[in-house]
């Protein structure tokens, strides 16, 4: 299911929110409306955590995570880090990384198995992705768009890239990630897909301006609504299958 929401009048819900299969982070804000919508959809399945990162609300652009772990920038305070450790499930590892490209959500897009990253991220950050998020890492750019986290979003079921991404680049990414890739937009034509929406394996939240056509593309590529929330058993089966293939 894909839902339209806004964060205090902003359509850029991916700027203020990080959504994975095991937790959801939401930037602290003045209104409860956005938070309450996410709570209503997610709280039976995963924790929805109100937090700031580096004393800002733009948690979606500063963090990157999946069901295995969460990476936060070096500017994250000790209090914020402790709050996250107390709020997230025990099996979710958290690490603070010293990365020059500190808006991690702009330069990294990942699911539970693979990550595509900006060509210039440090070797230490790449190592943290492997160790904490347990993903295979590929350095790519989407034609002229090196900020892969802003112009691309992926789940375990599919990947949505900016509309002007060349077909050969789409095919290359599909071959690397081993999931379907389609080009599209959100928020009535915006190519900043990572900033305009968040998605996990069973639900997506898109900006309020997103058209019904854009929502149908999102539901199709991410296979939303075809099944309920994945169980821990299905996750373990997929992990076992991938380990046996490596």
Swiss-Prot record:
Tell me the Gene3D superfamilies matching this sequence: L-arginine/glycine Amidinotransferase, Chain A
**Compartments reported by the entry:** Cytoplasm; Nucleus, Nucleolus
Q: What is its main location?
A: cytoplasm
Task: Report the GO terms under cellular component.
Answer: cytosol; nucleolus; nucleus
The domain of life is: Eukaryota
Q: Which UniProt keywords apply?
A: Cytoplasm, Initiation factor, Nucleus, Protein biosynthesis, Ribosome biogenesis
GO MF terms held by the record: ribosomal large subunit binding; translation initiation factor activity
The UniProt entry, under InterPro entries, shows: eIF6
Q: Which terms does the UniProt entry file under GO BP?
A: assembly of large subunit precursor of preribosome; cytosolic ribosome assembly; maturation of 5.8S rRNA; maturation of LSU-rRNA; miRNA-mediated post-transcriptional gene silencing; ribosomal subunit export from nucleus
Q: Which SUPFAM superfamilies match?
A: Pentein
Subunit-structure text: Monomer. Associates with the 60S ribosomal subunit.
Q: What is the role of the protein in this entry?
A: Binds to the 60S ribosomal subunit and prevents its association with the 40S ribosomal subunit to form the 80S initiation complex in the cytoplasm. May also be involved in ribosome biogenesis. Involved in miRNA-mediated gene silencing.
- Family stated for the protein in its record: Belongs to the eIF-6 family.
Specify the protein name.
Eukaryotic translation initiation factor 6
Q: Which organism is it from?
A: Caenorhabditis elegans
């Amino acid at each position: 299911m894909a839902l339209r929401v806004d964060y205090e009048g902003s359509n850029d819900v991916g700027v203020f929110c990080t959504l994975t299969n095991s937790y959801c982070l939401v930037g602290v804000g003045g209104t409860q409306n956005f938070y309450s919508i996410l709570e209503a959809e997610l709280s039976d399945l995963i924790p929805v955590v109100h937090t700031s990162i580096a004393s800002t609300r733009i948690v979606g652009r500063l963090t990157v995570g999946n069901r295995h772990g969460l990476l936060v920038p070096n500017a994250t305070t000790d209090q914020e880090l402790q709050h996250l450790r107390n709020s997230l499930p025990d099996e979710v590892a958290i690490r603070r990384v010293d990365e020059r490209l500190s808006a991690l959500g702009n330069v990294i897009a990942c699911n539970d198995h693979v990550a595509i990253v900006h060509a210039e991220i440090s070797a230490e950050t790449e190592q943290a992705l492997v160790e904490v998020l347990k993903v295979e890492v590929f350095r790519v750019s989407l034609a002229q768009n090196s900020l892969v986290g802003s112009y691309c979003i992926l789940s375990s079921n599919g990947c949505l890239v900016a509309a002007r991404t060349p077909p050969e680049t789409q095919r290359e990414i599909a071959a690397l990630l081993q999931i379907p890739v389609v080009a599209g937009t959100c928020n009535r034509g915006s190519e900043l897909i990572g900033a305009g929406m968040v998605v996990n394996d069973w639900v997506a939240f898109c900006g309020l301006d997103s058209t019904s056509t854009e929502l149908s593309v999102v539901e199709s590529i991410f296979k939303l609504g075809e099944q309920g929330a994945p169980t821990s058993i299905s996750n373990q089966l997929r992990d076992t299958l991938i380990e046996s293939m490596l």
